[in-house]
A protein has these predicted regions:
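An amphipathic alpha-helix adjacent to DNA-recognition modules
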Residues: 2, 6, 11-23, 30-60, ...
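Amphipathic alpha-helical interface segments
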Residues: 4, 73, 130-137
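Generic detection of well-ordered alpha-helical segments
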Residues: 41, 45, 49, 64, ...
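Secondary-structure edge/capping motif, primarily at the C-terminal ends of alpha-helices
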Residues: 54-55, 74-80, 108-111, 138-142
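Helical hydrophobic small-molecule/effector-binding pocket
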Residues: 58-106
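Amphipathic alpha-helical packing segments from all-alpha helical-bundle domains
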Residues: 86-133
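C-terminal peripheral helix-coil segments that are non-catalytic and often amphipathic
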Residues: 128, 137-163
């Protein structure tokens, strides 16, 4: 699917093209997926799983994880952007992060420190939206700006507002 998305708009890609590109039998495809949307959903779920694993490591900086994730997945993010589908990743993050925050130790998370005892669901949505818009701006600019400099700018800003 991703290879096809490099050549064709997502809306124009058919299941038949996916089957031909992957040399899968039609029956095998339909045993695993109902549609091309299911294929894309599977890819998104795998990315979120990888992101979760990276966040779950001890003493990680969530901003570093976010920017490393984006750097590693530049090509995929670019394909989603080209097809006006970046919102799908945002939806997945909005589903995942509130649940994740309830099950993981958030004591080293700078966002958790800002939240304190406040209602987390709205604050998580606020933070995801803020980070998302920064990433969207980076993608929209062609991913030419250094992620390290963007991350450093955000860290300085967080330090200012938490002082």
């Amino acid at each position: 699917l991703l290879k096809l998305m490099q050549e064709y708009p997502y809306a124009e890609i058919s299941v038949k093209q996916i089957i031909m590109e992957t040399s899968l039998a039609r029956k095998t495809f339909y045993l695993n997926f109902r549609s091309k949307d299911d294929v894309l959903e599977s890819i998104l779920n795998e990315l979120i799983r990888e992101y979760t694993e990276a966040l779950s490591k001890e003493n990680v900086d969530p901003l570093t994880v976010i920017f490393s994730f984006c750097d590693k997945n530049k090509a995929f993010l670019s394909l989603l952007h080209k097809n006006k589908m970046l919102y799908l990743l945002l939806l997945r993050l909005n589903e995942f992060l509130p649940e994740y925050s309830k099950t993981e130790d958030m004591s080293s998370n700078p966002f958790a420190k800002l939240m304190g005892e406040l209602e987390p669901d709205y604050l998580i949505a606020f933070n995801v939206g803020a980070i998302w818009n920064v990433l969207f701006k980076w993608i929209d600019r062609g991913m030419v700006d250094s992620l390290d400099s963007i991350q450093e700018t955000l860290k300085k800003y967080l330090k200012r507002i938490s002082a």
